[in-house]
Amino acid sequence: FQGQKFFIIGGDQHAAMTVGHIFKSRLNHVKNIRYTDIRTAAMVKYSENAFLAMRVTFFNEIYKMHKAQGCESTYEEFAEMVGLDERIGQSHSRVPGSDGKFGWDSHCLNKDLYELQTFGGSPLIKFIRELNAEHRSIES
């Protein structure tokens, strides 16, 4: 909670406003609180984590292409240059990841992508999960 820049609070209006008031009174840095229904709040969380998983998956694929092309730059230099575009940034572009392995292995990402897949059967979400399983099997 300490580093959070915003909160999405889902539930009935009275309960959500009460929670929001508690957050505002305890966490002075929080300026942006949005209130919505519980389903929308859940979809926001799942969508954020799915997007982050997709970024990791995307950059793992780009890493393979960078190596295959025989680029003279290191992947780290390359990723930094790509991230200079403010629309892209540096977030979730490190390959291998912080655990020294390819792909992602996060309880929240795994759980939230599973939930999102269950809701709508999205072929994109399914493919992200399949590619990640492939990436995780690669030895770094």
Language-model features: where?
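Structural/interface elements that position substrates and couple domains in central-metabolism enzymes
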Residues: 1-140
